[in-house]
Amino acid sequence: MTATPARRTSLASPATKPVAGGLALAFLATLAGGALLALALEAGGGGFDAAANFDTYLWRVARFTIWQAVASSLLSVLFAIPIARALYAEARFPGRGLILRLFALPLALPALVAVLGVTSIYGRNGLIAHISDMLGHPMQPDIYGIAGILIAHIFFNMPLAVRLLLAAYESIPDDHWKLAAQLGMGSRARFRLIEWPVIRRSLPGMIGLVFMLCVTSFTTVLTLGGGPRATTLEVAIYQSLHFDFDPARAVALTFTQLALTLLILLILRLTGRPSEEGFTQTATPRRYGSPRKTERLFNIIVIALGFLYVALPIAGVVVSGLTADLVRLLSERIVWHAIATSLALGFSAALLAVFLSLALVAAREATRNARIANIFDTGASLILVMPPIVIGAGWFILLRHFTDPFVMAPLMVVTVNAAMAMPFAVRLLRPAWDTAASRHNKLCSQLGIKGFNRLRLIDWPSIRRPCGMAFAFAMALSLGDLGTIALFGSDALVTLPYLLLQRMGSYRTFDAAGLALILGVLCLALMMIADRAAASRKEAFLQ
């Protein structure tokens, strides 16, 4: 077989790969730099009074932001340790695989949907309140405030910590378990001598990761905060622009949020990151010996409690959604308009995220300079330094000097959501692209296959499934986003999360429950597509 050099250039052409990667980095730099420039100009203007804006209110909000993140992180990890230990010990526990899959759902659900699930269980009219009435001890739990924030954050982050801890358990050598069985070690001795050293090494990075997720939690605090006493920096930024329209206050809050985020990332870099294997299905434990009856009973109770804590809010979303008048809801034009808008914006953001991520991955593989390759490799992750609400606030302040910010809302929602999905898309695409390049580069060079022909005939079959995974994941993230649309949303641009927030704000709880079910089904369907693509890709690789 012979091939003539293609005249058309593309992402697969060696000459254009670094250029395409540079353009992708320029996109991220413009998005983040534009927001920082706007904030700097606003702060440097005559109307910014540092003493007036860095006041007791700001420091009170900052203290609460740190306090709720510390409490959420410690509680999430504290509850995760016995659950992970029990799941690892009970290798043949019925439904163990389903429980691990269930523990992957909280991060896949949009935060607004999960919050409604939490309120359906722990709210004043929730399941716990109904059970207490039936038992003759009526109670009205208050879900709004610090209690609700902690419950929701544990729901999101405890399953993540469990999966990360299971990955740490997998690193324990077989010889340690064999020796423990031969010596007849009890549960406490095994934990102290074998398990705890491995857990202790994983704790700093794991707590730091959960802390970062809680500090940048916007939707959960916005809906469950319950008032000024339970306000974080990101929610305060939103309130200062959306309700008070106080750009100077927003600048002070944004700089504080940015400084806190940078400090957390620095600490994470010093302490190390948790193993990425925790995000995948864990293998069967290689443990020798069986637990004693009392230990097994304790393990079963712990697993059941962990399962109920995660499963009940998800079931609450389904039950509440099905009790809503879905027929009437789906007959409303605004609902279909919101669905269409969400799908259009999500599709555009996912397409942009995959294209830019491919450009970075291809540029990294084609670059021979190690430093430049490292820039391409880490460039997408650097955008995580700036939370979406910070980028949105910066551009909102910048655009108001030139045009109506709400006119630019679709563009801002697409670009910010695409940028936030890029770190995950790069992680999914990089292994497949590097593998395909190592297999085919030499042969394609000898045959003169390059440009669009190489991309179509050689590279695309290898990266098709990872691209589908990245696209579905990015679209699901965009569908459930509320951070950017909360700033730029209006009657002219209504997405499903924005409409859901409006219905919650007007106390139309049944409508909100129905919309939450629709949004949750859409996002979970996309996540299932990505998961199936990953599974089929793994099977094809093993064959």
Curated annotation (Swiss-Prot):
The chain crosses the membrane at residues 19-39, 64-84, 102-122, 142-162, 205-225, 250-270, 300-320, 343-363, 379-399, 406-426, 468-488, 510-530. PROSITE patterns: ABC_TM1. Residues 62-266, 339-530 form the ABC transmembrane type-1 domain. GO terms for cellular component: plasma membrane. Keywords: Cell inner membrane, Cell membrane, Membrane, Repeat, Transmembrane, Transmembrane helix, Transport. It is a multi-pass membrane protein. Its main location: membrane. GO terms for biological process: thiamine transport. SUPFAM superfamilies: MetI-like. The complex is composed of two ATP-binding proteins (ThiQ), two transmembrane proteins (ThiP) and a solute-binding protein (ThiB). Belongs to the binding-protein-dependent transport system permease family. CysTW subfamily. This is Thiamine transport system permease protein ThiP.
